[in-house]
Amino acid sequence: DKAIATSLVNADIVVIESFTKYCEILIETAQKMYKGYDVWSYYNKAIRKTLDSLKNEKSTVVITAIDEIVKIMQPTGGEYNTRRIKVQGKVHEGCIEKELLLVLFTEVRRGKDSIEYCFQTNSDGITSAKTPLGLFKDLYIPNDLNTVITSLEKYYA
């Protein structure tokens, strides 16, 4: 918490590498300190506190995370797959992205003689990728975080 607070005051760009590892450490800590429901209560409150602390008007905050494919049951009985940020527990499952302004998913696109590393900028119906309207004209852009940050700076200038 102190490191994040200090970074948000002193840096223009803050990178949280990796949110997934942070959640793993958080659950391990909670399991050492608490039992039963108190483990999940501590875990969920800590995630909420962290997500809230990252919201600011000064710094651009970049969070990396591992994604997972989750089967979702529809009211009709059918299923569909969705790809989203992986977290343990149910409270924040599928909900982390709603706290973020921009969500990019990495994609590896293989051509006949090439491999292209990309960011997916908006949902294809499976991912929870999202960007502000008009920020990027293409569904896939080069995997270059500097370009993304420069685009954000121009967009909000």
Regions found by a protein language model. Name each.
Residues 9-11:
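Short, high-confidence coil segments that cap the C-terminus of an alpha-helix
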